[in-house]
Amino acid sequence: DLVRSRGLGDVYKRQECTITCLSDSTECFIAGGIYEKKLEAFLVQKKEIDTVQYGSDDTKTHRKIKHILGAKHHEQVGRLLVNELYTVGAGGWSGFPPHKHDTNRLPDETRHDEVYNYRFRPGHGFGVQVMQYEDDKEGFGYQLFNGSTIAIDKGYHPCVVAPGYEMYYFTILVGLSQRSLVQYFQKTHAYQLETIPGIKDMIAKYK
């Protein structure tokens, strides 16, 4: 019954459920993670989704984040965080300064596994997912196309979209021991937290 109302945003379902598509076609993202308890289903209306915009064209970091399962649902979703991220304008960096969340060592960092699914506009656009597992050692990159999916369980992981294209990615974060995300920013680039407008407000939303 939750999926019958018009103007539906998103639905948080129990572990055991049946979903029936009533149209000829649809696109559905299913996000989940390991949790020890069964939780009740609830509806997330579009008007309830917390949105934050930060960065700037000058710093090539301008983007918008929609927190589908954000701080407002802290007590309802175990250790799950779900977001939509958009570059604002064409080209630019995301997930910058380089950061990671692969080790539980509070207050500096939490262990959160993450999955990205990417889309581009126009659809023939592309980007690059950068991965660096150790400081001061060479990393590597994955070229991203429309529909690419990346699973991240360790390392620094900024990404970039090519000039002339907009990038969207659906993100799923699951905490190992807690829901609130604590990101560790790479020391050599962390000073740029002071140069990117609004980034500290963005970081504070991952609760």
Residue ranges and their predicted role:
Residues 1-12:
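Single conserved hydrophobic/aromatic residue that forms the stacking wall/gate
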Residues 13-45:
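Extended acidic/polar, glycine-enriched regions
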Residues 5-6, 23-26, 33-36, 49-146, ...:
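Active-site region of the double-stranded beta-helix
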Residues 10-16, 145-156:
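Conserved SET/PR-domain catalytic core that frames the SAM/AdoMet-binding pocket
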